[in-house]
From Swiss-Prot:
Gene from which the chain derives: ttcA
Designated name of the protein: tRNA-cytidine(32) 2-sulfurtransferase
Residue span of motif PP-loop motif: 49-54
Species lineage: Bacteria, Pseudomonadati, Pseudomonadota, Gammaproteobacteria, Methylococcales
Reactions catalysed, as given in the entry: cytidine(32) in tRNA + S-sulfanyl-L-cysteinyl-[cysteine desulfurase] + AH2 + ATP = 2-thiocytidine(32) in tRNA + L-cysteinyl-[cysteine desulfurase] + A + AMP + diphosphate + H(+)
Annotated localization: Cytoplasm
Further facts: The thiolation reaction likely consists of two steps: a first activation step by ATP to form an adenylated intermediate of the target base of tRNA, and a second nucleophilic substitution step of the sulfur (S) atom supplied by the hydrosulfide attached to the Fe-S cluster.
Catalytic activity, EC: 2.8.1.-
Length: 289
């Protein structure tokens, strides 16, 4: 049996895995439909880092494509940043065995980052920007219409609270994004999926996971704190994390305080006019009780 082959499952384990697989496919398909992520004829580039999230994303998209209502192509793209100890043969071997079209971009961003960032400081920010630029360039040069990333529900929530607590903004990671230069569409098909489900799926499927800390940099401590906070919430108040994520899909600008999103100055002119929609009027009746 190959080193990365999935171990055989017993009946109960197989039943549980099938439920997990169906849930991930359903949630991924729902996110794709809700946000119009993939259209007929798209060339979708799955950014494969070698981590559990991107492996799961690629695997789920390959299976969804079989019965998808639209035709689209998939290509896996990995960026070999020349980090010391990076096992350069792992992804090509796996993708070749699976018959998946792929391309490896070889670019020594590791040396660039190390020459700029002081020792002991996190390199993730600069590394991410360099990586994004290289992937965007590849997409532009090869007719890629959608760039698929493996961010999941927990990533989105962690980012939301990072921006809330440390940035003073109400924003997260959108499931679908137009790049600043308006040339690329980035999609996150796993937006509805829990990290724990993805981790379990990747473990059972025995993907050849590549460690994400080869560069020696540690994940941002603030993000680690957000992850721990969400985990604690879910432990003490089951369902709270899902409720917070649902809130990101039910925004009421009239109940916040951003005058760029809602014209508060115009409310005087609306007095004694026809009743507003629930979004604009919800909560206002409390003031008159």
């Amino acid at each position: 049996m190959p080193a990365n082959a999935a171990a055989p499952l017993y009946a109960k384990e197989r039943y549980e895995f099938n439920k997990l697989q169906k849930r991930l496919r359903r949630l991924t398909g729902q996110a794709i439909a809700d946000y119009g992520m993939i259209q007929e004829g798209d060339r979708v580039m799955v950014c494969l880092s070698g981590g559990k999230d991107s492996f799961t994303l690629l695997d789920i998209l390959l299976k969804l494509r079989i019965n998808a209502p639209v035709n689209f192509d998939l290509v896996a793209v990995n960026l070999d940043q020349k980090q010391p100890g990076f096992p350069a043969d792992v992804l090509p071997n796996y993708l070749s065995e699976q018959g998946i079209p792929f391309h490896i971009i070889e670019q020594d961003t590791y040396s660039v980052v190390k020459s700029i960032i002081p020792e002991g400081k996190t390199t993730c920010g600069l590394c991410s920007r360099l990586r994004r630029g290289l992937l965007y360039r590849y997409a532009a040069d090869h007719g890629i219409t959608k760039i698929a990333l493996g961010h999941h529900r927990d990533d989105i929530l962690e980012t939301f609270f990072l921006n809330l607590f440390y940035g003073g903004t109400l924003k997260a990671m959108p499931p679908k994004l137009l790049s600043d230069d308006r040339r690329h569409i980035v999609i996150r098909p796993l937006a509805y999926c829990k990290e724990e489900d993805i981790a379990r799926y990747a473990r059972i499927r025995a993907f050849p996971i590549i460690p994400c800390n080869l560069c020696g940099s540690q994940e941002n401590l603030q993000r680690q704190a957000m992850k721990a906070m969400l985990k604690d919430w879910e432990k003490r108040h089951p369902g709270r994390v899902e409720t917070v994520f649902t809130a990101l899909q039910n925004v009421a600008p009239s109940q916040l305080a951003d005058s760029r999103l809602f014209d508060f100055a115009a409310l005087d002119s609306l007095r004694n006019t026809a009743e507003t929609t629930p979004e604009h009027g919800a909560g206002l009746d409390i003031l008159s009780r």
